[in-house]
Amino acid sequence: MEKVVTLNHDLPLLHFPNSRKPFSIPSPILRISSFKRHKKRSCLASSSRLGFYTETKTVSESHGVIVDNSTIGRRLLGLAAAVSVAVSLSIFCDSPALAESLTIAFPVSRAREVTTVQRTLVEAWGLIRETFVDPTFNHQDWDFKLQQTMVEMFPLRSADAAYGKLKAMLSTLGDPFTRLITPKEYQSFRIGSDGNLQGVGLFINSEPRTGHLVVMSCVEGSPADRAGIHEGEELVEINGEKLDDVDSEAAAQKLRGRVGTFVTIKLKNVNGSGTDSGIREVKLPRDYIKLSPISSAIIPHTTPDGRLAKTGYVKLTAFSQTAASDMENAVHEMENQDVQSYILDLRNNPGGLVRAGLDVAQLWLDGDETLVYTIDREGVTSPINMINGHAVTHDPLVVLVNEGSASASEILAGALHDNGRAILVGNRTFGKGKIQSITELNDGSALFVTVAKYLSPSLHEIDQVGIAPDVQCTTGMIDSLTAEIVEKMNSSVPLLEADSCVMVAEHELEARRSNGTAS
């Protein structure tokens, strides 16, 4: 999932029909009023208010402003700031003309948790109205969708049901990448983005045949590592709760917690014959866990003329906030060990933060190269260029890609390939040429909005097309080497040398060295 900086867009103001006919509202209403908003080229001055009314009353509309004809009931103003932001952010103007006043009235649920989601709905609706890449909103009336969804939420009694309605509204945009995740889901997402968590350092996954939770590896130096937990052990219980029908993400959430607290787990040791060899109980302290998206190894080999050469292998599993700095450190370390060429493995890397992808590209390029082109909602194509870049190394480079390389992986591969820096080896990439902004909303949920499409530096379409490699290969051993496999250099080199695509990459690097080709 990715973060970009988006610019202001020119949008029309909302217009609602004015009516002088009184009408009765037999339920609380949410009222958003914005008065005397002056359109300016780059900003919007507005005054917005939100009120909740808990009694039945008669209201009349005149010139777009709601006027109460009865005594105002108990008013809760705690949400005013949030809705004010949602309204003001959704409108950007380009002329000094005076805008009309605007009032929107919606029925507000009496269930507090549903009311919170209604507020999130308004917030999400405004952000999409401002930034979504398709200004037609999939050829529908986006203003009406807000009213319709708010009314549909009114009779609900649970936040889960209300979030379901919000997500259903987003699905009408026809873009699977524009979506909302709940506060709990967002916390898990952030762990993958910032590379830090509080837990025990276990990598677990569901065994495909049985569905049992199996330990894949431990983070080196973590509580799990210090306790001697091994790859292949089956996790059967957490704090007395059996894990039947519990998926790996739910189990991982149970293992996480505040530093200094403890979690007790039970592990089943399965021997090589597949039979059980006992269950043991382990009490683990939770600690800060540092996750790196980078793993590396040095592959020594002998050249045709008998010289010893070294190839640096770098596996990037995701584009987190630390990806560029971690990669820079890994390359510097290998440069100090006289590495003469590099393989950058992006296979099965689904993407992440776009900014991280651009930062990684700049580690390999010089000058003012174009890294990618973006196409905004108005169809305007704009380049994103480096400024006085200085590569960490100029040694020859091969990038490994496959059908699992997506989004920021494709931005990076395209930038290195189209600027003549790297050869691509593998299979055609996934083809996700859309960029999402990520915004944390007031309730702790997060909204992903597709704000732009992107093209490679050679203006090649990527979305739903992908990037074709220069040299095709399919890994014979396994689809891709995971970070856990290549974490320890000594044990990883034989595995790397058995990877057919790594072998192809080494052949291409040797050919470039023999031909004296610059990278």
Swiss-Prot record:
One CC-aspect GO term: chloroplast thylakoid lumen
> What residues does the PDZ domain cover?
186-274
Tell me which Gene Ontology terms the entry assigns under biological process: proteolysis
The yes or no answer to whether the keyword ATP-binding is present is no
Name the catalytic site residues. S407, K432
- A family per Pfam: Peptidase_S41
Subcellular compartments:
Plastid, Chloroplast thylakoid lumen
PROSITE patterns to which the protein is assigned, alphabetical: PDZ
* Molecular function per GO: serine-type endopeptidase activity
Q: Which InterPro entries match?
A: ClpP/crotonase-like_dom_sf, PDZ, PDZ_6, PDZ_sf, Peptidase_S41A, Tail-specific_protease
Q: What does this protein do?
A: Protease involved in the C-terminal processing of the chloroplastic D1 protein of photosystem II. This proteolytic processing is necessary to allow the light-driven assembly of the tetranuclear manganese cluster, which is responsible for photosynthetic water oxidation.
Belongs to which family? Belongs to the peptidase S41A family.
The record's annotation in NCBIfam families points to: prc
What is this protein's name?
Answer: Carboxyl-terminal-processing peptidase 3, chloroplastic
Natural source organism? Arabidopsis thaliana (Mouse-ear cress)
